[in-house]
């Protein structure tokens, strides 16, 4: 007996005429008057289920096979034959069906209905991977993850695991989740009435990280090329389709690199990842094109064949001001570009992915390198047609005196960043990096517009079930 995934059967990895065993769940059962049942069995290895043709001669046909409903788990053994019907190349002539798990009450099984709204599925996050759409999202998400790791490995990067618990606020925004073991009902106090964090687990205030970047820089300044890939947290009270409180970030950091270098790195990484999805997950992409967003395949193909445009922030503002479009948010030099501005640039003006660079210093973080004009920093955003910003990055400020000045300007205590400042005191180097919000990438590739539907268990304001 050979255990086979549904995907391996469809790929022709098992000879026609060979006997295999497929383990999975029933999607549908259809009975014919000729005493044959057709079971659609899926195991999650690919989009389509495999059809099993079950004769009524099986010993358990009447008392088990005819009672199978959507969601029942089965182990099906049979001979691979070429399928006479359209839609799939192979099917199984079943010789044995073992039922490993029944659905207790098929009438109340939440996934029994043919179609649920995506909003309703969020309330059933523990069962929604069984649906076509969330299963397809999971496979694409995995494909993108693996491709990103391969890309960095093939380009000589070291994967660094940065801490999830930190005392540093990378963005200087203060929107952080506190980590504490103090008794909330009986908080220790200092003499002036403030919470005494000396008595806490770490002996100081601690938070969930908003970014692995600062820690990543320490390793880039020793190993030259590193990347992080892990969860980050923002206590941002935003109930939108674009925000999560817990999400994953890809953050490369490169020593001796300029803003131009990481713009090229971002382009290479995105094209590598998108090409992987086009090559490996076309079955899922075809589903998304049919049921979610008809442009997904064409959009990815266009992306990987396009050269990235580049434009200075100042020039981008001028383009937006002169385009004749009335935007909801008026455009002026010094504002942070909104999604409508970003999408106009990528979709209508350049009609290609675009790198906007050299932003005003007052709207960017303290660690971004100050340009010679004293007004802008060496920062960039990568804007993609169909979604807007997908990557944000910068050349880092490697000059200690300028870094200290920026910390002071932003009312940040430089003593809190003593270790980060040490990198500038001991063999400082120009270096640069960027951050990619991974869920936003999955959303772009699948066309699934709400970011809560491209992560297994979304965390958002007042949403922490499961």
Curated annotation (Swiss-Prot):
Coiled coil: none annotated. It catalyses: tRNA(Asn) + L-asparagine + ATP = L-asparaginyl-tRNA(Asn) + AMP + diphosphate + H(+). Keywords: Aminoacyl-tRNA synthetase, ATP-binding, Cytoplasm, Ligase, Nucleotide-binding, Protein biosynthesis. It holds the Pfam family tRNA-synt_2. InterPro entries: Aa-tRNA-synt_II, aa-tRNA-synth_II, aa-tRNA-synth_II/BPL/LPL, Asn-tRNA-ligase, Asp/Asn-tRNA-synth_IIb, NA-bd_OB-fold, NA-bd_OB_tRNA. Its main location: cytoplasm. One of its GO terms (molecular function) is nucleic acid binding. It is found in: Cytoplasm. One of its GO terms (cellular component) is cytoplasm. Homodimer. PANTHER family: ASPARAGINE--TRNA LIGASE, MITOCHONDRIAL-RELATED, ASPARTYL/LYSYL-TRNA SYNTHETASE. Belongs to the class-II aminoacyl-tRNA synthetase family. This is Asparagine--tRNA ligase. It comes from Shewanella sp. (strain MR-4).
